[in-house]
Amino acid sequence: MHSNVGLAGLAGLLATASVCLSAPADQNITSDTYFYGQSPPVYPSPEGTGTGSWAAAYAKAKKFVAQLTPEEKVNLTAGTDANNGCSGNIAAIPRLNFPGLCVSDAGNGLRGTDYVSSWPSGLHVGASWNKALARQRAVQMATEFRKKGVNVLLGPVVGPLGRVAEAGRNWEGFSNDPYLSGALVYETVDGAQSVGVATCTKHYILNEQETNRNPGMEDGVEVAAVSSNIDDKTMHELYLWPFQDAVLAGSASIMCSYNRVNNSYGCQNSKTLNGLLKTELGFQGYAMTDWGAQHAGIAGANAGLDMVMPSTETWGANLTTAISNGTMDASRLDDMATRIIASWYQMNQDSDFPSPGAGMPSDMYAPHQRVIGRDASSKQTLLRGAIEGHVLVKNNHSALPLKSPQLLSVFGYDAKGPNALKQNFNWLSYSPAIQENHTLWVGGGSGANNAAYIDAPIDAIQRQAYEDGTSVLYDISSEDPEVDPTTDACLVFINSYATEGWDRPGLADNSSDTLVKNVARKCANTIVTIHNAGIRVVGEWIDHENVTAVIFAHLPGQDSGRALVELLYGRANPSGKLPYTVAKKAEDYGSLLHPSLPETPYGLFPQSDFDEGVYIDYRAFDRANITAQFEFGFGLSYTSFDYSGLQISNPKQSPQYPPSAAIQQGGNPHLWDNIVTVSAEIKNTGRVAGAEVAQLYIGIPNGPVRQLRGFEKVDVSAGETTQVQFALNRRDLSTWDVEAQQWSLQRGTYRVYVGRSSRDLPLTGSFTL
């Protein structure tokens, strides 16, 4: 909202809303007062309590803030210019030995500097389904941030969640499922902060498309940012879920998003900031704007916003003036400053932390101090992370692994490395369907990060060919290349691009599909690798008899080629699973294929109605009984696994609602009480060792037929059997009760499914609550 509304004014506000909302549907809306009341006001902004592990940090912070002048408090709340390459800076307070803060992009590696690594993207981590690996990636990636003097890592991403198939930033997040995203964001936050680098989990909340994400001008008239309109139940059960896991892990900051939520801008929305984040979830850190996402002054502060980036025109001295005239309580400013300083103490950045921005030159091409962020100890994690995010979805006639080929033919624009590797790689002012000039290892925008090197597929293949005495022919520019008929295999490389600022033009492109079909027409063993920054439909050629193997290679980071060769030659066994659903045709995504566009009467105030509720991705496909090309959770291996021995413990009989308790970070602590345990046995029935992702889905009464509620990735040697266990807590088994405003256990029969994917579930059972 553009104005601050207190609880006392709620009745009048809602009355106004009821009048406005009765306006004729064909009457163009020209004022945002029409929407007042759609996002309920929640005031005042709750003060941080220093609960749990935050107690010591809050005690120090309150003592620190008590010594500040009003101007010094204000300076903590907004970014300032600094002679460094940080994405944003908070000014120092030298007299109290506070050196300031450097905050920098992004969740997949440090951007805009040198001597750092390009890590597998969030989507790639999601495809690995590996919690331990996600944590190790976070630890080592954050260590690079620390060495460079970055206090706050602007990530990880769990918004967007992937509601819109063509959304431009889906690749930065982990998955289209809240449980998988939540499990991985927990490990990422916990891992990064274990080395003293604060995370800024983003984009809070409902930032599900890039189209109209910011206000803009249309024929000289301002068009507001898109409003994501959602009900309370869907908010909790889908989009808030992974943010709750991030808060539970202790995320030091949360970035509010550009879009509007129920027609109130995300960074001045008192319901989402004061109500959900700070009250219900017990968030102890600070809420930071996305860059340029501040659209109100004092109203934003009262709504729960704590920090503006990269600078502000509406706060500054206006905050102290507002306190003087009573528009804002002095306690609100104290709380803003306390939350920021408490997070600094919570990360132990007051002791032995590099100077903010020490390794972040403002100009990489001017003389600057060499600060090495990389470390040799991260090599294994970089490579393993790159390997495990590849998903093998087709492997007819055991085309893979390759078997001592004498001749390989390599085709496709995605096989080669870039012609130049520079600062701010992949920041484009548009979104092409493909990156046609080189292999794709990261998406575009602020999530794109600098690489120490790029190991392209063609380079890695030729290194292996040298070792094996294999001949390699290649044509990486032609759409209809010639093929030597004696070749053992044709390796075709294509990609699917996505970037911040733009939604994708489609889920496939004609040029790449034509290339695959042309090669397959001439080559009986065509193996396709797709570096995809999101869902890529393959219906044009997936059933071609000469397309023998297909790999969704996602965005593996700088070790792209090296990782791929490990898989192609069988030194590594594919273990990735799809973190999204691949449809047979794009139209199967229905209304969630494209972003929402402005329509009459809301042309000046674009609306995106989340009226599908929780039914996105596999939930939607299950509900409509649509057969997917490759379902959520699907992925092949060079071995095979059998499932048996399903066991379900006697559930702990529990009250419908969680017992009352003081809110901790993450919410009511009883949400994490275990109710029931499920276990199963997995046997490797093949000839080689492999890793399997065992997946648990639960059918909650009165909910979707199946929802992911557990997964474990286990290594199993050939012929061996291992057991997996899934502990189900109260939140896992609850639905959101809108009237009671509580998580509610349902009375009835819960269905249990365990297996290889969301639609390959050989073990079934049930229990009753």
Swiss-Prot record:
Enzyme class: hydrolase
Reaction it catalyzes: Hydrolysis of terminal, non-reducing beta-D-glucosyl residues with release of beta-D-glucose
Key words, A-Z: Carbohydrate metabolism, Cellulose degradation, Glycoprotein, Glycosidase, Hydrolase, Polysaccharide degradation, Secreted, Signal
Residues that span the membrane, as ranges: none
Signal peptide: 1-22
One Pfam family matching this protein: Fn3-like
PANTHER family attached to this UniProt entry: BETA-GLUCOSIDASE, BETA-GLUCOSIDASE M-RELATED
Similarity comment text for this entry: Belongs to the glycosyl hydrolase 3 family.
Name listed for the protein in its UniProt record: Probable beta-glucosidase M
Organism: Aspergillus fumigatus (strain CBS 144.89 / FGSC A1163 / CEA10) (Neosartorya fumigata)
Name of the coding gene: bglM
